[in-house]
Amino acid sequence: MLELTMAAVSGQDAGATAGMTMAEAPSRPGAVLRVGRDGNECGLVTPEDWLFVSRVHLEFLCGPDGTWQVTWLRGSQPDPASEVRLAVGSHAQPLGYGATVALPYGGSGELIVQDRTEPRSVNVGFYHEV
């Protein structure tokens, strides 16, 4: 099971957890969870006017062995309006535009989608239950 929590945070709300949303999916091959502005495609939906987030921004996909990966999907623009970082424990790393990374099996962490022009972000926490 992969559990996701999401909080949309703007400068004045930094540190607040109000308005968190959650989604989960069983660890079955082909299971998918998406994060973005499109409520028809995404289980976790960001504010519609936050254009630094694509319609479908992040895709979590369960592989054939029950492990999960996340992809920062390429949008319609050649250069993204945001940056994405993956934090697991005390280690944080940037996630490249269009890149895919495996999530730790049985682990937890956070993906931060940071607007490049304003102090706001979308914080997506994950927990992979074994």
Q: Which residues does each predicted region cover?
A:
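Generic signature of intrinsically disordered, low-complexity segments enriched in small/polar residues
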Residues: 71, 129-130
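Forkhead-associated
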Residues: 43-44, 50, 57-114
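Intrinsically disordered, low-complexity acidic Ser/Thr-rich regulatory segments
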Residues: 1-50, 61, 100-129
